[in-house]
From Swiss-Prot:
The chain crosses the membrane at residues 7-27, 106-126, 189-209. GO terms for biological process: potassium ion transport. The lineage of its organism: Eukaryota, Viridiplantae, Streptophyta, Embryophyta, Tracheophyta. The keyword Plastid applies. One of its GO terms (cellular component) is chloroplast inner membrane. This is Potassium/proton antiporter CemA. The keyword Membrane applies. It catalyses: K(+)(in) + H(+)(out) = K(+)(out) + H(+)(in). Signal peptide: none annotated. It comes from Liriodendron tulipifera (Tuliptree). The gene is cemA. Belongs to the CemA family. Keywords: Antiport, Chloroplast, Hydrogen ion transport, Ion transport, Membrane, Plastid, Plastid inner membrane, Potassium, Potassium transport, Transmembrane, Transmembrane helix, Transport. GO terms for molecular function: antiporter activity; proton transmembrane transporter activity.
Amino acid sequence: MPKKKALTPLPYLASIVFLPWWISISFNKSLEPWVTNWWNTRQSETFLNDIQEKNVLERFIELEQLFLLDEMIKEYPGTQIQKLRIGIHKETIQLVKMHNEDHIHIILHFSTNIICFAILSGYSILGNEELVILNSWVQEFLYNLSDTIKAFSILLLTDLCIGFHSPHGWELMIGSVYKDFGFAHNDQIISGLVSTFPVILDTILKYWIFHYLNRVSPSLVVVYHSMNE
């Protein structure tokens, strides 16, 4: 019986890993028709940001420039100009459709992520006993490691996360999260997060080392500083 109770966190851990993926797929499919119908009915412009508006205007300017360029190169008969205008009109309609699809994508992904976060939060609260057992496993595993391996692991993680070569990885990760929420790519925001987030993590890590590790395992701090030098 105790052995069976000790193994119960394993299915719980597996469910935590796969539950976000399942929630994302199921809610995306179930919410998509409702969000599409709501957007097409309301035609709200609340979610229009400056970057999307700039992209739409750039496309319209390109279409206008193409039309003017074709008229300057040679004189079109009336029928050809009419065909050209029809083509530009079709391209404009396609641009509006793409604009609406982008907004639907933003609303759908943002709603799905909020729902996923709420469900996982409730799931974690309900599975508090399993989390306690998992925490005891992790603590026991870390306790059995030598100070050298612990210090090496801390150095490896810090170099990967906040080392001099980590900005590109942070840029990819933050860009992926940004895209997953359905927001348009924004180099300024991503660059700002990349330049500040690792610094915050580095400060938290240093505080943790000096405040927590110095109290719990002074020998580990000595080994860490020796390896870091």
